[in-house]
Amino acid sequence: MFADGRPAGHSRCDSRPSGAGVALAFEGTLGAPRPDHVVAGEASLDAGSCWARVRVAFDGLSVPLDVPPDVLLEIEGAPALVGATAQRLVRAGMRPGQSRDIEVVRVRSDRSVTSIAGRCIWVGGRDWQLILPLESTGFSVRPDGAVAGVEAAALLVE
């Protein structure tokens, strides 16, 4: 839900094997019942769940994007992509209750791209927390890397 009570929209992400990695195709809408923005794109992950290629468009306009291989990719309207980072952290030995500093590349519906230093916490089971300056977001990741749910971002007050 948006702050004004409107539904936030919907999203989907399909994956298929691609060489030693995975190819993802994603799409989503922001706003309902009539979307304010539409996001669509494709991403490739290598065998280590690192980003190999990412293409994103909002409302049909391409977003120029150069994504480092080991960032958490947060695309407005496409929350499923954070699951790839959770899988990568688990493969690197992260355990429940542990946290890691991580770079977050955030892509917004206005086509802005920012890089933010954050902290990713594996709370336990499927539950993860992303802590950024002044905000916190929870997400639930299935063992296959699919994001099963996203908790609304909370604004933190200093």
Residue ranges and their predicted role:
Residues 1-3, 28-32, 107-108, 124-128:
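Intrinsically disordered, low-complexity segments enriched in polar/charged residues with Gly/Pro
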Residues 2-64, 145:
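N-terminal mature ectodomain segment of secretory-pathway/periplasmic proteins
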Residues 24-27, 49-51, 77-80, 153-156:
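Glycine-rich loops and low-complexity Gly/Arg-rich segments
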Residues 42-47, 127-157:
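Gly/Pro-enriched, hydrophobic low-complexity segments
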Residues 46-136:
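Solvent-exposed helix/loop surface patches that form functional interfaces
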